[in-house]
Every structure is written in C-alpha cells, then in structure tokens.
Amino acid sequence: ESYKDFQRQLLLNPEKGDLIKDGGGIRKIRWNLENKGKSGSIRIIYFYKIQKEIIYMLYAYTKSNKANLSDSETKILRTLAKELNNE
C-alpha cells in the first residue's frame, strides 16, 4: 500500500484511527509498508481538524522501536493539536 493510497483511505474515513487517551483529539493508525508484512508496519499519529476538513500528519514510528507514545510525547502533541485547532 503506497503512502498515496493510505492518504486516500484516510481522506475517505478521517476518523478511522483510534483516539489517543488524553491526546486532545489526536489519533493513531497503523500503516503497512509495501512488501514488509505486519512486522513492517508503522504507526502514524495525526490530527483531523473537523471544521476545515484538514488532516495533519504529526508523527510516525515503527512498532518495533516503540509500542506507544510516552506521556510527555502525548502532552506535546496534544498542545500542537490545540494550536492547530485554533488556527
């Protein structure tokens, strides 16, 4: 699945990703890299600004390097989402 296909799918269903607890509206979704299988998937953190129908890609990481965001990372991204929402 190419990144362009991933973007198209997310545009069709921008609330597909799971809401991150205490994340201020940020979401996490898994994206499989081409020819890598499940072990080659990455997690993408994004924010969907409903009023303007804009999706901001905020952060990406491989599951093999990190299981979840730390509390401090969530706090930083929550602050960013708040700023983006107020634009």
Which sequence ranges carry the predicted segments?
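Short, surface-exposed coil-to-beta transition loops
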Residues: 39-44
